Each structure stands twice: as structure tokens, then as C-alpha cells.
A protein has these predicted regions:
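Rossmann-fold cofactor-recognition segment
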Residues: 45-57
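ADP-ribose/adenylate-binding Rossmann-like module
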Residues: 83-101
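Hydrophobic/small residue at the entry helix of a nucleotide-binding pocket
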Residues: 11-13
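N-terminal Rossmann-like NAD(P) cofactor-binding module of classical short-chain dehydrogenase/reductase
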Residues: 66-71, 92-93
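Conserved N-terminal Rossmann-fold NAD(P)-binding element of oxidoreductases
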Residues: 4-9
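C-terminal catalytic/substrate-binding lobe primarily of soluble NAD(P)-dependent oxidoreductases
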Residues: 136-382
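Rossmann-fold NAD(P)-binding glycine/threonine-rich loop
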Residues: 95-115
Length: 382
């Protein structure tokens, strides 16, 4: 039996680890701190072991036919994937595909090995929802590339109860702060829309959720353009809006105004040091309290117009909450990762470097819904 090497047992990993062990897979859980790996597997029985992680120890253990899941910091992924290719092992990660990862595609195909990335929440479930909506639209009577097309996808990790700061951290805030310094590129009114500072592009965004109507704030992040082709928005389509972005509670931009001002001034090593200091301060003041539950909202919208009239308008919505056992974020990041692991082991995903697979999207979303996630498709024209 192929052995699964799960690298990293941080906060977002535990449900996926436990699911694979409970389903009878052979698993080695690697973590720099062995105690964390032991906590992640506490109370389980099966063919699993925990080990102290180092690249050297992992390399010595990895065998041809095995599979490695990298839930390590992003700068490890390519090294782990390259080691897998040289050993004859497959690879799964929830992170975005870096250019260096994409460059491994030819080598992976040559060796008949599969490297799957972007199979967490965002990126991951958002891709799957987009694929399902696009399949539905293409199969409809109203489909035509000449229609005006509009697409938006927003995801946010929130606290169950809104606080004055309009945000609570379930792990170190440094990543959130660094993201505020990242420019974005999207499509608006059929034109390229570049934003250097996220807070300059904040918009209200109202959703009709199971618990009622709620207005959030959203803004674009990263470069949305590579995902147009991935989702099927080809050059012959009349696409007016295409944006992937971040969702926050209403009032977030006001509550964070002072942080925006400071982040904008930070430069060089001193700026990086101040960012770490600011992160630690925010963690002290706004961490998710013990016993407090988190929340994840994900909304993917696709609509089309002909002669100025809407002819298709559907959304794939999810409003999920953590419980006493796991955070919603951990469930929704690591459970799809475990789906991808099983699909690779069954040979269901071809060789090469891939994001969340199109073919499995509907099935995996149905399985997540069956696990109790509040999610589904809304037809706004019905």
C-alpha cells in the first residue's frame, strides 16, 4: 500500500489527516514539533506514525509509489515536489501553483506522476464551484460566447460573532498583513483593472444567506487573469467582469483604516520588522478566543446578459461555521486535500501539474455538503 506522508500538522490540517487515517490509509504525519503531530492524531487507531520533520529525514523515508502532502510554508512546496519526482512519488498541496511548480509539469508527465495543487478552500473549493456553474451555463439553452459575461468569486475567513475590529485571527496575522501590500489585477467593464492597494477597491457585497441578508465588504486580490482560461472564459467570449477576491465583515475598511495607513509607509528590513511587531500586537488583541467558533463565507457568482437583459444568473454559496471539534477553516482546507490524495492514489487525475480538478468538482462539493456544510446553488432568475 502506498504511504501518505503528510508534512505539517498546523491548525488547518487536522480534519484531513484524521479522515485519511480513519479510512484505513497508511499515513506518516511529519511536523517539526512532534507533540503537534501527536495531538493531531490523538485517539486514532490504524496504520499511522508521527515523526519529527526535516527534509533529510523525509527524503530518507520517501519511497517510489508514495504520496506527499505539503502543508508546510509555501517556500517548501517546490522542493518537496521535486523530491517526489526524483523518487517516483506523487504530490498534493492546497497552495497556489507558483511558476516554479508549473515548470515541473513536463517532468511529471514524463515520469507519469501527478502533482495536484490548489485543492483547499481558496484556492480549491472556489475553483470547483466555478467549474460547476460554468458547466451548468454551457449546458443551458441561453449559452452563447457573444453574451455579456460577469463572474466574481469572494471568500473570507471570519469569526462567528462580529467584533469591533471586524476581524478575528485564527492564526498569526502576518500573512493577512502581507496580503495588504499585494497588488491585484482583474477585469472590470471589459477592461484591465489594476489596484496597488486593496483598500482602494473595497465595495459593499450583499448576500442572502440561510440566516438572513448580510452586507459584507469585498476587494480583489492577486491576479485574476490566469483563472479566466482555467474556468473557460476564452478570448472569444464577451467577458465584462472577472474578479477573484477577499470577503470581510461590513465596516472592516473603517475599522482597519489606521492599519492601512501604517502598512502603506513600511519599507525595507525595518518595515518587515515592524510588520512582525504589528502582527504580534494584533494577535494579542484580536485572536479567536478559546471556545469561540470561526466562520467561512464563500460566494461564486456567474451571470450573463443579452441585449441588456439578464438571461442567466446563479451563485454557489457557502456559509460554514466551526464547532467544538474543528474550525470551519481547517475542515474546508484539509478535507478537499484528503479527497485529492485519494483521487491521485486511485489514478483518477492524470500525470502533470494540476489545480483542483474539473472532473471531480461536483462530486467533491456534494461530499462536503453531505458532511454538514451549508452550501448550494441559488438561481436568481427562478
Amino acid at each position: 500500500m502506498a504511504r501518505i506522508h503528510w508534512l505539517g500538522s498546523g491548525l488547518s490540517t487536522v480534519p484531513g489527516i484524521r479522515r485519511l487515517i480513519e479510512r484505513g490509509h497508511s499515513v506518516t504525519v511529519w511536523n517539526r514539533t512532534v507533540e503537534k503531530a501527536e495531538a493531531a492524531t490523538a485517539g486514532l487507531s490504524g496504520d499511522f506514525e508521527v515523526k519529527a520533520f526535516s527534509m533529510e529525514a523525509f527524503e530518507a523515508d520517501l519511497q517510489a509509489g508514495d504520496l506527499a502532502v505539503s502543508m508546510l510554508p509555501g517556500d517548501f512546496h517546490v522542493a518537496v515536489a521535486d523530491l517526489c519526482l526524483n523518487t517516483g512519488a506523487n504530490f498534493v498541496s492546497s497552495s497556489y501553483i507558483a511558476p516554479e511548480m508549473k515548470a515541473l509539469d513536463a517532468k511529471a508527465k514524463e515520469k507519469g506522476l501527478t502533482l495536484v495543487n490548489e485543492v483547499g478552500l481558496d484556492p480549491g473549493m472556489d475553483h470547483m464551484m466555478a467549474h460547476v456553474l460554468m458547466d451548468d451555463y454551457r449546458a443551458s439553452d441561453v449559452f452563447s460566447p457573444d453574451n455579456e459575461h460577469y463572474f466574481r468569486s469572494y471568500c473570507g475567513g471570519l469569526s462567528e460573532v462580529k467584533n469591533e475590529f471586524c476581524y478575528k485571527f485564527s492564526w498569526a496575522p502576518l500573512g493577512v498583513l502581507k496580503a495588504l501590500r499585494s497588488p491585484s489585477k482583474s477585469l472590470r467593464d471589459g477592461e484591465v483593472y489594476n489596484v496597488s492597494r486593496p483598500w482602494d477597491a473595497v465595495q459593499d457585497y450583499t448576500l442572502d444567506l440561510p440566516k438572513g441578508r448580510e452586507t459584507f465588504e469585498v476587494y480583489p486580490n492577486r491576479d485574476s487573469f490566469p483563472f479566466m482560461e482555467e474556468y473557460g472564459f476564452t478570448e472569444d467570449w464577451n467577458t465584462q467582469l472577472f474578479v477573484r477576491g477577499t470577503l470581510r465583515f461590513g465596516g472592516w475598511s473603517t475599522a482597519w483604516a489606521d492599519i492601512f495607513k501604517e502598512v502603506e509607509t513600511l519599507e525595507g528590513p525595518e518595515g518587515e520588522a515592524r510588520l512582525v511587531e504589528l502582527s504580534e500586537d494584533l494577535w494579542q488583541k484580536n485572536a479567536l478566543d478559546e471556545g469561540e467558533h470561526d466562520r467561512v463565507v464563500l460566494s461564486v457568482d456567474l451571470w450573463a446578459k443579452k441585449d441588456g437583459k439578464e438571461i442567466y444568473n446563479k451563485s454557489y454559496l457557502m456559509d460554514a461555521y466551526g464547532d467544538d471539534e474543528h474550525t470551519a477553516m481547517a475542515r474546508l482546507v484539509s478535507t478537499p486535500v484528503s479527497f485529492a490524495v485519494e483521487a491521485v492514489l486511485k489514478g483518477e487525475i492524470p500525470a502533470g501539474v494540476h489545480a483542483a480538478p474539473h472532473a471531480q468538482s461536483e462530486q467533491w462539493l456534494a461530499e462536503l455538503k453531505a458532511m454538514g456544510q451549508d452550501m448550494g446553488i441559488v438561481d436568481h432568475l427562478a
